[in-house]
């Protein structure tokens, strides 16, 4: 199921109707802009709703755990902002972490972040360096395998922080982080007592990514996410809404795909 990570990140940033794995263009609702937008020699197709089927149960939404629907299908990749991502060649590229320099011993990363681009959390609060420091400190405290060797984080100014590591693991950490380690809101989680993974408040799904959670129906086993705007960090969002529906079995899911009930699985 982790293959959806690349599908959803593509959906968030540059998905076209023809480029979606398993999509049935005739079944998709493409009632966004009336005409495709020319981009060089190719045109971008807008999709009003991309319907995704899964067999994973929709059991709440919490960006701090990989055990729920967000973690299992990596919806964190579109609800929150990954620090770094990988391109089609598997090479690490900047995202919310907009650039970095490594020390000679590979024990220090001096990184810049998109905290000056006017991004806000889905509840309207501004994204700041406090969120960056909070997120990395959380990963340190939890001894996250994605950030193995990370021992410290310190803000230098409003857009820059230094990350301290051991054993020259800078390259290893950047590769491990790609697509999976995302920014978390300090103003939400610093107030939560107990295990973050067990928190079920309405703000548990708040992110600053290109899509925000707008509805969860556990009884109907469906979930909807909507684009926050037409563009995100300078890139067009060609899919307006993501609808996720859970099916009881793989056979039922395949039938739904074949009948055009869903566009991807």
Question: Can you name each region flagged by the protein language model?
Answer:
Residues 46-56, 108-113, 135, 161-163, ...:
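Short, well-ordered beta-strand elements
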Residues 88, 179-237:
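Gly/Pro-rich hinge or "lid" segments in bacterial periplasmic/extracellular proteins
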Residues 1-50, 91, 152:
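Short, low-complexity disordered leader/linker segments with a strong preference
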Residues 51-104, 206:
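N-terminal lobe/hinge region of extracytoplasmic solute-binding protein
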Residues 46, 58-66, 91-93, 171-174, ...:
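Short, solvent-exposed loop/turn elements at domain surfaces
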């Amino acid at each position: 199921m982790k293959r959806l990570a690349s599908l959803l990140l593509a959906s968030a940033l540059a998905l076209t109707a023809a480029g979606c794995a398993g999509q049935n263009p005739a079944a998709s609702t493409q009632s966004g802009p009336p005409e495709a937008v020319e981009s060089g020699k190719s045109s971008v197709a807008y999709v009003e709703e991309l319907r995704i089927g899964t067999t994973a149960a929709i059991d709440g939404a919490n960006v701090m755990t990989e055990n729920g629907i967000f973690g299992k299908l990596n919806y964190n990749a579109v609800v929150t902002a990954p620090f770094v991502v990988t391109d089609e060649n598997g090479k690490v590229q900047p995202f919310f972490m907009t650039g970095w320099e490594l020390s000679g011993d590979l024990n220090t990363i001096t990184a810049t972040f998109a905290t000056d681009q006017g991004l806000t959390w889905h509840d309207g609060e501004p994204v700041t360096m406090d969120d960056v420091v909070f997120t990395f400190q959380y990963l340190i405290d939890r001894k996250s395998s994605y950030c193995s060797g990370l021992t410290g984080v310190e803000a230098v100014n409003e857009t820059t922080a230094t990350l301290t590591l051991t054993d020259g693991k800078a390259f290893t950490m950047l590769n491990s982080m790609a697509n999976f380690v995302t920014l978390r809101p300090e103003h939400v989680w610093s107030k939560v007592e107990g295990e973050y993974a067990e928190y079920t408040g309405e703000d548990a799904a708040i992110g600053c990514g290109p899509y925000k959670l707008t509805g969860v129906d556990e009884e109907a086993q469906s979930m909807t996410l909507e684009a926050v705007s037409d563009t995100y960090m300078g890139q067009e969002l060609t899919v307006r809404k993501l609808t996720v529906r859970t099916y009881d079995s793989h056979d039922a899911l395949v039938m739904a795909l074949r009948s055009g009930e869903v566009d991807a699985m």
